Amino acid sequence: MKKSGSGKRGPPDGNHQSAAPEKVGWVRKFCGKGIFREIWKNRYVVLKGDQLYVSEKEVKDEKNSQEVFDLSDYEKCEELRKSKSRSKKNHSKFTLARCRQPGTTAPNLIFLAVSPEEKESWINALSSAITRAKNRILDEVTVEEDSYLAHPTRDRAKIQHSRRPPTRGHLMAVASTSTSDGMLTLDLIQEEDPSPEEPASCAESFRVDLDKSVAQLAGSRRRADSDRIQPSSQRASSLSRPWEKPDKGAPYTPQALKKFPSTEKSRCASLEEILSQRDTAPARPLHLQAEESLPPVPAQPGQLSRIQDLVARKLEKTQELLAEVQGLGDGKRKAKDPPQSPPDSESEQLLLETERLLGEASSNWSQAKRVLQEVRELRDLYRQMDLQTPDSHLRQTSQHSQYRKSLM
């Protein structure tokens, strides 16, 4: 009989040779598959320390065993049972699974115990031996007195990380989802122990992006409000550029942000507080701020009449086009031959579609004309009511004074 390739890793310990084995007994070992059935052979197994000795007959000295297996090459010992099998043999099988590390040559071992109780006893004993073998490898690690263990995170070099300022697109996205007055909170956090020689380029770029985004946001909102209250003829003259000063023609240049002292590690400031820290421009009035304080411009009396004239001209033009298209379609229908050709049918469909669209446009213009006429009548009615209200108030005052005189 030749011995297995997996032997001991080192010289045997004297304590292991003199100590009594943990467990001994006869079990059946799986030796392969034959032509018709599996081959199982009785073997005498001795568990001593972290070594497993297997021999064909009972021996007093473990050195005479045919096979020696080092349990440090194995990962676990567990029960081996088929789920759908009812055979008593399958209730007593257990296996030693080898480690899956590269270079391991130990084979997987399968045993069959005499009874399920004996199987549980072998599994517990082999599992404890495998654990001791793994711990023995760890206990063999020695540390010299001169060497020391460095802390992996505490002793490494510190690297200063500078925070990147928010981009312009991010500021616009945050401002669009903020409250109606445009206030948004910016988290200005400075890193600990900033280097004194670091330039203030980040702060300057942050100030430029912030001022541009705020000016564009405020201008777009106020421009929308002014478009709703001002007529179309005055929109071009009323719009002013938010980045230009009203008193000077030169464009406004944003100022750099103040550098916070090192004592302020982190600070949460609002947009209003940041803009109030500007030194060079303490008072910067804008045309847009003046437009906010002005009352809404009332509609001009002639505006409604101009709209009515425009609607009337559009209605007349639409009706002329509709009549022209209808005449063209009637002429084609009269001059058309009895057999239809595909181009004639397509042109006829195009004329019908054009006629339908012009008819819808004509009805829409007519409806707009009626609505404007009703608006004009309502405006005249409100004017008459406003004129009659002071006269009725005077009459009530005179009647009240006459009633008081009669009482006196």
UniProtKB/Swiss-Prot annotation:
Transmembrane segments: none
Span list, region Disordered: 1-21, 217-264, 325-348, 389-408
Keyword presence, Protein transport: no
Disulfide bridge positions per record: none
Pfam families listed in its UniProt record: PH
Site (Interacts with capping protein): R154, R156
CDD domains reported in the protein's UniProt record: PH_PLEKHO1_PLEKHO2 (cd13317)
Domain of life: Eukaryota
One GO location term (cellular component): cytoplasm
Residue numbers bearing the Phosphoserine modification: S226, S270, S341
Functional note: Plays a role in the regulation of the actin cytoskeleton through its interactions with actin capping protein (CP). May function to target CK2 to the plasma membrane thereby serving as an adapter to facilitate the phosphorylation of CP by protein kinase 2 (CK2). Appears to target ATM to the plasma membrane. Appears to also inhibit tumor cell growth by inhibiting AKT-mediated cell-survival.
Protein name per UniProt: Pleckstrin homology domain-containing family O member 1
Organism: Mus musculus
Gene designation per UniProt: Plekho1
